[in-house]
Regions:
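Acidic, Mg2+-coordinating catalytic module of metal-dependent nucleases/exonucleases
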Residues: 115, 121, 126-200, 207
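Conserved DEDDh/DEDDy metal-dependent 3′-5′ exonuclease domain
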Residues: 45-136
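Solenoid-like repeat scaffolds
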Residues: 194-198, 227-237, 264-271
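N-terminal accessory regions of nucleic-acid-interacting proteins
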Residues: 1-11
Length: 276
């Protein structure tokens, strides 16, 4: 991306995107029949949904989406790098008439979510993150009556065959909840990344945060967070990983004394030659 970390973190640049499709496998025969987008404006989240009532409306849906893509530099999705965006690129290619306006940057929040919360939660599905990380009571809605994603394609096929449009209301609601959850998740992740010390007390979350900063090349910050994670307490396996990462960072920064001390601890505790 041509944008700096600071520019990526500006909510005014974000366009949230989520699609509902005729299949979950992707491929040239899969359509995005509902494309939802959202953005922050005037202190609130604006949500817009483009619905394809029949296949001949695909061009209009993609044109409307393209106009929105032109207005924001940073596309924000959840698993969008693997699913939503490749699918939309395929649909743009199939219609031929429209060239997609590729965003300057694409933030797929699935990846930082895995780093931050998979060790604690196991599943990092958006609905799980809403419940256990974001807090449904703070969000102002719950997924209690939400529809299962696997049922959505059939509801659309039934509608195309002349069925009642009423079941689609739940699909629209599901898409809107995904967008609102995505916006809340972006705020949470960037809040963690931007805070000097972080409103974080959970050792596993601190460990995930330290790994993100480590990958971004921010060694000093990563080192401090690894130390905080160890102080907060980690499961044995993760504790060993944190010490190993700290030892590697110390060695790269020329602090051979600390690196040797950490490797010594690891060797004593794990009785593993891998520490060396």
């Amino acid at each position: 991306s041509s944008l700096s970390h600071q520019e990526l973190a500006e909510p005014a640049r974000w366009l949230f995107l989520d699609t509902e499709t005729t299949g979950l496998a992707g491929g040239t025969g899969t359509y995005a029949f509902l494309v939802g987008v959202a953005w922050w404006e005037a202190g609130g989240l604006q949500v817009e949904q483009f619905f394809m009532r029949d296949h001949d409306e695909e061009h209009a849906v993609l044109t409307a989406l393209n106009d929105r893509l032109a207005e924001r530099q940073v596309l924000v999705t959840f698993n969008g790098k693997s699913f939503d965006w490749p699918l939309l690129e395929t649909r743009f290619t199939m219609t031929r008439a429209i060239r997609p306006r590729a965003p300057a940057a694409h933030l797929d929040l699935l990846h930082p979510a895995r780093q931050l919360w998979r060790l604690r939660l196991g599943s990092v599905r958006l609905s799980e993150l809403e419940r256990h990380v974001l807090g449904a009571e703070r969000l102002g809605w719950t997924r209690q009556h939400d529809i299962e994603s696997a049922l959505i394609p059939q509801i659309y096929f039934d509608f195309l065959r002349g069925g009642s449009p009423e079941p689609l209301a739940r699909v629209f609601q599901h898409n809107q909840m995904d967008l609102r959850g995505l916006a809340a998740l972006a705020g949470r992740i960037f809040g963690l990344l931007d805070s000097a010390n972080g409103p974080v007390s959970d050792g596993l979350e601190l460990f995930g945060l330290s790994r993100i900063h480590h990958r971004r090349g921010e060694a000093v910050r990563a080192q401090r967070l690894y130390d905080q994670a160890l102080d907060a307490g980690l499961p044995k396996r993760v504790d060993v990983s944190a010490r190993r990462e700290l030892a590697l960072l110390a060695r790269r920064q020329g602090d051979y004394e600390r690196a040797a001390s950490l490797w010594g601890q690891l060797a004593d505790e794990t009785k593993s030659i891998e520490a060396y």
